[in-house]
Regions:
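Intrinsically disordered, low-complexity regulatory segments in ankyrin-centric signaling systems
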Residues: 1-33, 42-45, 127
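Ankyrin repeat start-site detector
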Residues: 10, 42-43, 75-76, 106-109
Length: 127
């Protein structure tokens, strides 16, 4: 396995920044050019987890359309649905649920997060 060059590392860091910033078009371009949709940083955060946490539903949808895995968790056991639930981002939660995210997956799960923080509107979304 070859190591990444400084330029390649900078490009990948930039891709994570696009997910955090919600630049769906630029992120989609990079994914279409070959960057993996399930790219993960050193904390285990995927592009999808970061986009969900930073409340970017269009970016979340762009990632889902390109194969991002809704079941992936970071090193703390958190997933994109838990992140969106914590932020009370209804649009992102709906997009993730429509893509098959399980509200009972992860540690803590999205459902447990909603219950812990007394977020009844989020709990209702889980059915």
């Amino acid at each position: 396995m070859s190591e990444l060059t400084p330029d390649e590392l900078a490009l990948l860091r930039g891709v994570f920044d696009l997910a955090r910033a919600g630049d769906a078009d630029a992120l989609a371009w990079h994914l279409d050019a070959g960057v993996p949709a399930n790219l993960t940083n050193g904390q285990g955060d995927t592009l999808l987890i970061l986009a969900a946490y930073h409340e970017h539903p269009d970016t979340v949808r762009a990632l889902l359309e390109r194969g991002a895995d809704v079941t992936r968790t970071n090193l703390r056991g958190q997933n994109a649905l838990t992140s969106a639930t914590f932020k009370q981002d209804v649009e992102t939660v709906r997009a993730l649920l429509e893509a098959g995210a399980d509200p009972d997956a992860g540690t803590p799960s999205a459902r447990a997060t909603a219950q812990h923080f007394d977020l009844p509107d989020m709990v209702k979304l889980f059915g």
